[in-house]
Swiss-Prot record:
Function according to Swiss-Prot or TrEMBL: Catalyzes the condensation of iminoaspartate with dihydroxyacetone phosphate to form quinolinate.
Protein name per UniProt: Quinolinate synthase
Protein species of origin: Sulfurisphaera tokodaii (strain DSM 16993 / JCM 10545 / NBRC 100140 / 7) (Sulfolobus tokodaii)
Any one annotated GO CC term: cytoplasm
Similarity comment text for this entry: Belongs to the quinolinate synthase family. Type 2 subfamily.
Name of the gene this protein is made from: nadA
Length: 308
């Protein structure tokens, strides 16, 4: 495909890399130098020698990369690519909860803005949340913005999580129901169900495996099973097919609900936008120095805890 060749040439000429989230469309994953979940890509961003980082993901991910790499030029192919979770929590709301629970550590899911991250003690992903919460010497923890993930972490750790906001949800995972699971199991009787922790608790309880996008890939590679129903954003099927081509994957959707399984924000990142952003070096992500330093501090504190 000519467009893919052009993007690869631009990367080479500009010493640029593309970081692609696992939810990206197939073509975007093909041009990405690294694919992974939010945490994985944040770490990759810190280790790169490239001059330019194009973040093929939603805006909060590009913000994080910019905060962690103040000397790099970080580009977002579409700065309007938001996130329902990130949009659900603002700085003023988080400050109020911190005042209400002054002794509670603040653990924020990575799907939030850099400005709220700057108020956090720890920044987690779905793959690290349980370990971080379990490690903290506190029985009450402020956790946001994903209430579904909070419910799952509470179940696994026995700790009280004060959800901020109380009803933060991913618009894709919020659509999953037990009825969808039952229909999928009937349609694909030889498949096992993998679910993302952003899903409602009833879906997680009905699943054979619960994990982040990277954990799903690892599980699919190592599992003796050949067929999988995947309860997460539709683009994940692309990542699984690319990395585990010998196995078969089915999205947890009906024909009628197919569009609802695609995150409208992730879908905004296209090859055409990546090419334009890189070619013209537009939509550079800028984070105020003090905000970036505080967010980076929380991220590095989390990494130290995870590496212990």
């Amino acid at each position: 495909m000519e467009l893919i060749k052009e993007i690869k040439n631009l990367k080479r000429n500009k010493n640029a890399i593309i970081l692609g989230h696992n939810y990206m469309e197939y073509g975007v994953q093909l041009v990405s130098d690294f694919t992974g979940d939010s945490y994985d890509l944040a770490v990759k961003a810190m280790k790169t020698n490239a001059d330019i980082i194009v973040f093929a993901g939603v805006y909060f991910m590009a913000e994080q990369a910019a905060a962690l790499n103040p000397d790099k030029k970080v580009l977002s192919p579409d700065p309007n690519a938001g996130c329902s979770l990130s949009d659900s929590l603002d700085v003023d709301t988080l400050k109020k909860y911190k005042e209400m629970y002054p002794n509670a550590p603040v653990v924020l899911y990575i799907n939030t803005s850099i400005y709220t991250k700057a108020l956090a003690d720890y920044i987690v992903t779905s793959s690290t949340a349980i370990k971080v919460v379990k490690s903290l010497d506190a029985d009450t923890i402020i956790f946001g913005p994903d209430a579904n993930l909070a419910n799952y972490v509470e179940r696994k750790t026995g700790k009280r999580l004060v959800k901020v906001p109380p009803n933060g949800r991913c618009i894709v995972h919020a659509n999953y129901t037990r009825q969808l699971v039952e229909l999928a199991r009937k349609k694909y009787p030889n498949a096992i169900l993998m679910a993302h922790p952003e899903s409602p608790l009833e879906i997680l309880e009905a699943s054979d495996f619960v994990g982040s996008t990277n954990q799903m890939i690892k599980f699919a590679k190592e599992s003796p099973y050949k067929e999988f129903i995947v309860a997460t954003e539709l683009g994940m099927i692309n990542a699984l097919k690319l990395q585990v081509p010998e196995k078969t994957f089915y999205p947890l959707v009906t024909t009628e609900a197919y569009a609802c399984a695609r995150c409208p924000y992730m879908a905004m990142i296209t090859l055409e936008k990546i090419k334009r952003s890189l070619e013209e070096e537009i939509y550079e992500v800028k984070v105020p120095k003090d905000i970036a330093e505080r967010a980076k501090e929380a991220f590095e504190r989390t990494m130290r805890l995870l590496n212990n």
